[in-house]
Swiss-Prot record:
Keyword Transcription found: no
Protein name according to UniProt: Phosphomethylpyrimidine synthase
Domain of life where this protein originates: Archaea
InterPro entries according to UniProt: ThiC, ThiC/Bza_core_dom, ThiC/BzaA/B
Lineage: Archaea, Methanobacteriati, Methanobacteriota, Methanomada group, Methanococci
Cited function: Catalyzes the synthesis of the hydroxymethylpyrimidine phosphate (HMP-P) moiety of thiamine from aminoimidazole ribotide (AIR) in a radical S-adenosyl-L-methionine (SAM)-dependent reaction.
Enzyme class (EC, first level): lyase
Membrane-spanning segments: none
Originating species: Methanococcus maripaludis (strain DSM 14266 / JCM 13030 / NBRC 101832 / S2 / LL)
Reactions accelerated catalytically: 5-amino-1-(5-phospho-beta-D-ribosyl)imidazole + S-adenosyl-L-methionine = 4-amino-2-methyl-5-(phosphooxymethyl)pyrimidine + CO + 5'-deoxyadenosine + formate + L-methionine + 3 H(+)
Length: 426
């Protein structure tokens, strides 16, 4: 049984009750959205995961990527990133490790959080294939599905799998060349496999078998966008849309089998094209939850891509995206450090909150009202408690204090609020 099959059967699970309470939503309404495939609750049956709802009519959720690379392997560092994710309100974590003992790293990450955990299994497949055969492109079907099954048994809650990379998608790419080609790592692995062996993508060819594996453990399938644009010039091209058409067809198959599914999206997109991208996805994929990376709205800000992504993420979420993958200041430059994780997470949560306010979500507006109440009362401690990051504003206030404990050092004696209050007392 999965959350989706239960919902279709009219069964109300404990996870549904929890999510409905968190969202301020009637559980029957939520159950109907899950049954239709408009909402997912990524929760592997083998793991005690905190239930998190992702999809239409819910708050916008934020994911944190972390993990090792061949150039930097430090489990302790990754666990600090997990700790930061827990502390600053991430809704999910993805382990994208490609260096070191991948199963051991994943085990430690899972042990140190109750947030939903996602992976990209093709990364481990590529690492294993290189160790076993000497080249990533020599991976085979058995290796691919063995890794997926092993991760499902370990408790991974959702998996990014690039099932839409097909011979037809690769043909669209070749017929309409890009500035930057394929920038998705998993997408590149499978594109290279197809081109070198002239074989179909096993994840597409054996999609029904894949669904059997995922359904057994109620792993949510996150259909990866292997043809996402890697620069603004490549946005919304034929390869991207061809893959999206295929993903829409695969969404139908998932729903028929009762497998929870969401769809991933771009990427690098000019601000004026973001809304159109969201509408196209929601139409082609029939309102499946949409999970976007950014989108980044300019390529000129390495070192500041948490900002470019937050700008794009706000509009994306207002226009239909349900799940934002954070982007850190280190994007396009190096592996993220702990401080990068915090900066990226807070920036993405700002985008999510701004979008939820624009969409009129009651939970988002409740928080805004509480902040306004705290400010009018000059209740600084309450303001810090409500803030997305309590530590930074508290520290900043201590650095340059005001003589008046109700005011801040910007205005001091000339505080507008205090001045009007004083007049009101007369």
């Amino acid at each position: 049984m999965t959350q989706m099959t239960d919902a279709k059967s009219g069964i109300t699970t404990e996870e549904m009750k929890f999510v409905a309470k968190e969202e301020g939503m009637d559980v029957e309404t939520l159950k109907n959205l899950i049954a239709k495939g408009y909402v997912v609750i990524p929760k592997n049956v083998n793991r005690n995961t905190k239930p998190v709802g992702i999809g239409d009519n819910l708050r916008t959720k934020v994911n944190v990527n972390l993990g090792t690379s061949p150039d930097f392997i430090d489990i302790a560092c990754e666990l600090k990133k997990v700790e930061i994710s827990n502390k600053y309100g991430a809704d999910a974590i993805m382990d994208l490790s490609t260096g070191g003992n991948l199963p051991e790293i994943r085990k430690e990450i899972i042990k140190n959080t109750n947030l939903p955990i996602g992976t990209v299994p093709i990364y481990e497949v590529g690492v294993d294939a290189k160790e076993k055969y000497g080249r990533v492109i020599d991976m085979d079907e058995d290796l691919i599905f063995n890794v997926i099954e092993r991760q499902a048994k370990e408790g991974v809650d959702f998996m990014t799998l690039h099932c839409g990379i097909t011979k037809q998608t690769v043909s669209a790419l070749n017929n309409d060349p890009r500035k930057m080609g394929v920038v998705s790592r998993g997408g590149a692995f499978l594109t290279a496999y197809i081109m070198y062996h002239d074989k179909e993508n096993p994840l597409y060819k054996e999609f029904d078998y894949l669904l059997e594996l995922l359904k057994e453990h109620d792993v949510t399938l996150s259909l990866g966008d292997g043809m996402r644009p890697g620069c603004l010039q490549d946005n919304t091209d034929r390869a991207q849309i061809q893959e999206l058409i295929t993903l829409g067809e695969l969404v139908d198959k998932c729903r028929e089998k009762g497998v929870q599914v969401m769809v991933e999206g771009p990427g690098h997109v000019p601000y004026n094209n973001i809304e159109a991208n969201m509408k196209i996805q929601k139409t082609l994929c029939k309102n499946a939850p949409f999970y976007v990376l950014g989108p980044i709205v300019t390529d000129l800000a390495p070192g500041y891509d948490h900002i470019t992504a937050a700008i794009g993420g706000t509009l994306a979420a207002v226009s239909g995206a349900n799940f934002l993958c954070y982007v850190t200041p280190a994007e396009h430059v190096r592996l993220m450090k702990e401080d990068d994780v915090k900066e990226g997470l807070i920036a993405s949560k700002i985008a999510a909150q701004a979008a939820d306010v624009a969409k009129g979500h009651p939970v988002a507006w409740k928080l805004e009202k509480e902040m306004a109440d705290a400010r009018i009362k000059h209740d600084w401690e309450r303001q810090f408690e409500i803030a997305l990051d309590s530590n930074k504003p508290r520290k900043m206030r201590e650095e340059i204090p005001s003589k008046d404990e109700k005011a801040c050092s910007v205005c001091g004696d000339y505080c507008a609020l205090l001045m009007v209050e004083e007049l009101g007392k007369r």
